[in-house]
């Protein structure tokens, strides 16, 4: 799937075979270390990432039963990916104004996924920022300005 990194490999394995073994392999995504990594990977200056986001995520991830809910969501994300062709058909047919702001160093959603919007909506505006998955953590003002500018047109 275009735009999805190899980081999805264990999740895709679970989609293909929702066994307890594959489900257990996804628990690595729910550790405090992985949550911190998701917030900081690809960020040139990790001191710009407030601990609020990953600390709050970790607080909620450690609540009883939350791990099972998250694992169910990983499994269900397959239904979202299955709808990608429908989203793309909508974009090709209706050509809505489209702004995609992307962390160019996102370890899960790669730049080709954002660039694909331009294939379906030739006027799509795609911006890449020097950051990771949680682009708002480090580029909130820049993203807000891009959205305001986009909506003003």
Positions of PLM-derived features:
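Short, hydrophobic alpha-helical segments
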Residues: 147, 151-153
């Amino acid at each position: 799937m275009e735009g999805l990194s190899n980081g999805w490999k264990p999740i895709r394995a679970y989609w293909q075979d929702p066994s307890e073994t594959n489900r257990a392999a996804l628990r690595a995504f729910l550790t405090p270390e992985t949550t911190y990594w998701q917030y900081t990977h690809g960020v040139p200056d990790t001191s710009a990432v407030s601990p609020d986001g990953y600390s709050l995520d970790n607080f909620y991830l450690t609540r009883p039963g939350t791990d099972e809910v998250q694992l169910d969501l990983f499994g269900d994300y397959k239904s979202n990916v299955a709808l990608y062709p429908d989203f793309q058909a909508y974009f090709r047919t209706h050509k809505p104004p489209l702004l995609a702001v992307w962390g160019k160093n996102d370890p899960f959603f790669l730049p080709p996924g954002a660039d694909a919007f331009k294939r379906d909506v030739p006027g799509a505006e795609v911006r890449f920022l020097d950051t990771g998955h949680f682009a708002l953590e480090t580029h909130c003002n820049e993203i807000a300005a891009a959205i305001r500018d986009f909506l003003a047109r």
